[in-house]
Amino acid sequence: QDLPGNDNSTATLCLGHHAVPNGTLVKTITNDQIEVTNATELVQSSSTGKICNNPHRILDGINCTLIDALLGDPHCDVFQDETWDLFVERSKAFSNCYPYDVPDYASLRSLVASSGTLEFITEGFTWTGVTQNGGSNACKRGPDSGFFSRLNWLTKSGSTYPVLNVTMPNNDNFDKLYIWGVHHPSTNQEQTSLYVQASGRVTVSTRRSQQTIIPNIGSRPWVRGLSSRISIYWTIVKPGDVLVINSNGNLIAPRGYFKMRTGKSSIMRSDAPIDTCISECITPNGSIPNDKPFQNVNKITYGACPKYVKQNTLKLATGMRNVPEKQT
């Protein structure tokens, strides 16, 4: 281009972009190593190491599992009627009551976790002809023998244990969760001394379901001084339905029901400390920012979280291909 003037000077106009001394390597469909002037990391690869208590309501299980809190293990009484968005179970959690098992533990745990509440309503069950409120030295409540607070251990009265047949209708407009159990004595002598009959039976029914459990008498590994066990079961009673309990022995009866709710509550196993901070996304490793589209911290998440990927890094090129000028 000629410049105005009398000296016939010319200038050159260059179209292009600035190169940088040290570009960023990115992957493309056709090449694993392309250097560009600028790139943005898309993968969140670290956590804060702590769980933020805002905006989600975090309930720290401390020494209690969710199921122990549900049953009413004496050392978990502090959790009665609690609510949460995320229940955090710790590796140090332990049971400290009558040894038990839950045949479908994971399903019950998930059901209660998603409900987000341990709200419990006591009901007036009538248990005629039996002794109520059984306890054990394996389940101390203070200095005294105790039991799970949400369950009622029924044993013989005098020398009899009559057939029990109890009904409880659901006249409300929400689902009710009933927790009950079956006692498995360690010997035949223990069976008859508690329930008279040589073999008990427990049947729990609604219009939609029925469960019949026959106790398994026999010695098991000793736990807290006991070789007997309790198996825990549950029944959901829908509005308009009725709960029917029939038994001639070995029944661990419900004292009422847990009010079921629908929502997005959940549970997570983590030993990360809980802190006063704000984060929408929580993993077992701790909270993470959600300003990137991907994360590789943990597959398990709660809240509004980036999508999990296996890659440690994914970069988005935000600049042109970097071709520094070679000078001699």
Swiss-Prot record:
Keywords: Clathrin- and caveolin-independent endocytosis of virus by host, Clathrin-mediated endocytosis of virus by host, Disulfide bond, Fusion of virus membrane with host endosomal membrane, Fusion of virus membrane with host membrane, Glycoprotein, Hemagglutinin, Host cell membrane, Host membrane, Host-virus interaction, Lipoprotein, Membrane, Palmitate, Transmembrane, Viral attachment to host cell, Viral envelope protein, Viral penetration into host cytoplasm, Virion, Virus endocytosis by host, Virus entry into host cell. Its main location: virion. It is found in: Virion membrane; Host apical cell membrane. It is a single-pass type I membrane protein. The keyword Flavoprotein does not apply. The keyword Membrane applies. Glycans are attached at N8, N22, N38, N63, N165, N285. SUPFAM superfamilies: Viral protein domain. Disulfide bonds join C52-C277, C64-C76, C97-C139, C281-C305. Coiled coil: none annotated. In natural infection, inactive HA is matured into HA1 and HA2 outside the cell by one or more trypsin-like, arginine-specific endoprotease secreted by the bronchial epithelial cells. One identified protease that may be involved in this process is secreted in lungs by club cells. Palmitoylated. GO terms for molecular function: host cell surface receptor binding. Gene3D superfamilies: 3.90.209.20, Hemagglutinin Chain A, Domain 2. Homotrimer of disulfide-linked HA1-HA2. Major glycoprotein, comprises over 80% of the envelope proteins present in virus particle. Belongs to the influenza viruses hemagglutinin family. Binds to sialic acid-containing receptors on the cell surface, bringing about the attachment of the virus particle to the cell. This attachment induces virion internalization of about two third of the virus particles through clathrin-dependent endocytosis and about one third through a clathrin- and caveolin-independent pathway. Plays a major role in the determination of host range restriction and virulence. Class I viral fusion protein. This is Hemagglutinin. The gene is HA.
